[in-house]
């Protein structure tokens, strides 16, 4: 007789409180999945207790970097898996692959690798010399897993080709949106009024938004593009009235809170506790990101709020154009004049199609995962 499904999830770093896109992606994945199947989450001891999640939460891992190579974890995790009668082990990222393979062998458990990007390619894009070593390890781990989840179709296609995986074992499980429909127009109009009052923006000025962790190199490079490429191009269009709001923590001190750009329509808001009001109140989200790999979580969040997005082609990976209507404008990487032109002409009035939420709503994503593992 087949045992009832029970998932053990190994999350090797802090995700609670979930503030950044990657943290939200894992936290929301398990919040919605734990509504459908039992989940035991094993994570580091520096996590806060999550709210609104049905999972059995076990913050038992050390915060030390050596935790990734600690052989004694095998015994403690084997005990947890056996005590909870777990049938599946989901590893967030491939780094604990060695441990997952051992647990698969000794606990007779289905091993699932939940990839958030091709890690080796992400490190290659940031200039790490050892990326090929990591690529070989990723390939080895994914080949040992019974089920592989990839964040985009592009990542799945890469893995099928370069890791020689069986297609039936590989599935695209995207980052999602908590919203099952866009916020109503009055709610968006009220949010816009609040933002204009807070940041002293004129009523006839459009609000352009960029959000991201600003000490993360791909986001910092995108900020440099906004300051040095897009701003001169936009200022050269006298018919465009706008302000760009920059949100996010970690801005290096060398940028001096962007004070030198205050006269050039740049507003630095820093880290904001309620990013939703910015997604609701902005007219346009700009995403001039060309590095980093994986799906850009901020693009999904912006579209989920009914916000028009102008993005590089690299920054739009993982978002099918067929389900976004006129809300996602994709510009070739490096064509910054074309990007500025797209900002000036973007359709901000049309709505986001229902098909977007059919694909990206977290509830639907969790149902897909349940069907795969059951």
For each of these PLM feature ranges, what is it?
Residues 154, 175-176:
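Carbohydrate-associated surface elements
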